[in-house]
From Swiss-Prot:
GO BP annotations listed: hydrogen peroxide catabolic process
Record PTM Phosphoserine, positions in chain: S3, S35, S49, S102, S124, S131, S138
Function per UniProt: Involved in oxygen transport from the lung to the various peripheral tissues.
CDD domains named in the record: Hb-alpha-like
Species this chain originates from: Cephalopachus bancanus
Residue numbers binding O2: H58
Protein name: Hemoglobin subunit alpha
Residues bearing the modification Phosphotyrosine: Y24
Residues annotated as domain Globin: 1-141
Keywords, alphabetical: Acetylation, Heme, Iron, Metal-binding, Oxygen transport, Phosphoprotein, Transport
GO cellular component: blood microparticle; haptoglobin-hemoglobin complex; hemoglobin complex
Residues reported to bind heme b: H87
Assembly information from the UniProt record: Heterotetramer of two alpha chains and two beta chains.
Length: 141
């Protein structure tokens, strides 16, 4: 459960991401594909090379979903319901992949905003992406 301080930290951190969200989403995906090659199996139709327009496009989708989650931080299950349905019923993504992408996103944010990535902010963002992952996997049951 996100505390009021966590919510403040998440919103402040995401505000600093600003217009770079899509780029960071793509970078996190590239990081995931390189670090965890089995995740590529969900994207057989993608050009997974560095700078690929398909990876950039999906990175923007990831970032947009996170922006939605930040904007509806008190009601993420409702805000992400359609996305949860998509991943559970159509795409059938293994839930462990959300954790892998979450880790890669945190690394990406830490690389781009090292001064802002304090232990407290790191903990808050980790709890946030874990909450998003929980919401996205909630329809698997």
């Amino acid at each position: 459960v996100l505390s009021p301080a966590d919510k403040t930290n998440v919103k402040a951190a995401w505000d600093k991401v600003g217009g770079h969200a899509g780029d960071y989403g793509a970078e996190a995906l590239e990081r995931m594909f390189l670090s965890f090659p089995t995740t590529k199996t969900y994207f057989p139709h993608f050009d997974l090379s560095h700078g690929s327009s398909q990876v950039k496009g999906h990175g923007k989708k990831v970032a947009d979903a996170l922006t939605t989650a930040v904007g509806h931080i008190d009601n993420m299950p409702n805000a992400l319901s359609a996305l949860s349905d998509l991943h559970a019923h159509k795409l059938r993504v293994d839930p462990v992949n959300f954790k892998l992408l979450s880790h890669c996103l945190l690394v990406t944010l830490a690389c781009h905003h090292p001064a802002d990535f304090t232990p407290a902010v790191h903990a808050s963002l980790d709890k946030f992406v874990a909450s998003v992952s929980t919401v996205l996997t909630s329809k698997y049951r």
